[in-house]
């Protein structure tokens, strides 16, 4: 357990000799769909019902919660805890107490400083997938901050970049009977996320191919203009000036990983090596955008 959290915080810096070939970096993302309905129809949505709430910090005055997904199962005892099933923010003191309880239960002692080992908004496993159509694609963009992939794509990641990721099972909860190639139905409410409530559902989820959640463990150095001006001594929230931050990747920011987050964002970035490897398998429902 301690090793899992350590991998989320470890940083590896590399130096580059003169004459090294300039690398390209790519953001991986979903294709552009005709409509939000098509997006929801193909990709569905992923739910993590258990997680840490947001925090109201009395030191910096900010109310916030992050989007980190942990590969750690929520302990059964906490699955009915009001502050684990609701993201509604609580005070910094309450948050610190809840974190200490969880770290004791999970036997996390190597990174036990409050707001470092665990953070506001952290989400636990398990996760549940609802897709209004029968999922066929290699990539499903059902979750921010992680990848939902077919078994063959999961196997490629485990083989080529196991030190950069960890893999969690996805529990398939609701799946529609229709093929995603058909036009998406218009839900009565008009909201794309409600399509799942108005389509015929496959009764036997075991008929659906397995999907897996890939969690990215690494991140780049800070982007130009994105170095935090300060970090709150209470909740450890970094203060980044979004007006000066540039959403681009440079070679100086790279730490040697094949897949990683662009620091201060949820943009998933990959190297040329990763792109070339994945493209050999002709994956579906993914695009590479130079960043």
Predicted regions and their residues:
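Short cysteine-rich clusters marking metal-coordination/redox-active sites
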Residues: 57-60, 232-235
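Short microdomains enriched in Cys/His and/or Lys/Arg
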Residues: 74-106, 242-272, 277, 281
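Short N-terminal edge-element motif at the start of the domain
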Residues: 97-143
């Amino acid at each position: 357990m301690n090793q899992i959290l350590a991998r989320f915080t470890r940083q590896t810096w590399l130096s580059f000799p003169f004459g090294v070939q300039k690398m390209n970096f790519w953001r991986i993302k979903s294709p552009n769909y005709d409509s939000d309905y098509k997006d929801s129809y193909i990709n569905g949505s992923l739910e993590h019902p258990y997680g840490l709430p947001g925090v109201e910090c009395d030191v910096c005055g900010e109310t916030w919660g992050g989007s980190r997904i942990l590969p750690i199962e929520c302990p059964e005892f906490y699955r009915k805890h009001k502050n684990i099933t609701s993201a509604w923010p609580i005070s910094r003191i309450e948050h610190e107490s809840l974190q200490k309880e969880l770290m004791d239960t999970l036997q996390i002692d190597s990174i036990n400083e409050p707001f470092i080992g665990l953070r506001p908004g952290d989400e636990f496993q398990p996760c549940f997938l609802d897709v209004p159509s029968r999922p066929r694609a290699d990539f499903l963009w059902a979750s921010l901050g992680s990848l939902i992939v077919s078994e063959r794509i999961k196997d490629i990641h485990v083989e080529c970049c196991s030190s950069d990721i960890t893999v969690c099972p996805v529990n398939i909860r609701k799946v529609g009977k229709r093929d995603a190639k058909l036009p998406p139905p218009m839900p009565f409410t008009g909201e794309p996320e409600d399509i799942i409530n108005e389509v015929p559902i496959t009764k036997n989820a075991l008929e659906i191919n397995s999907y897996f959640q890939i969690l990215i463990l690494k991140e780049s150095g800070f982007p130009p203009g994105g170095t935090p001006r300060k970090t709150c001594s209470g909740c450890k929230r970094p203060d980044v000036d979004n007006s000066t931050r540039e959403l681009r990747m440079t070679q100086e920011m790279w730490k040697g990983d094949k897949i990683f987050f662009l620091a201060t964002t949820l943009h998933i970035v990959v190297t040329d090596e990763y792109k070339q490897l994945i493209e050999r398998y002709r994956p579906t429902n993914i695009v590479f955008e130079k960043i």
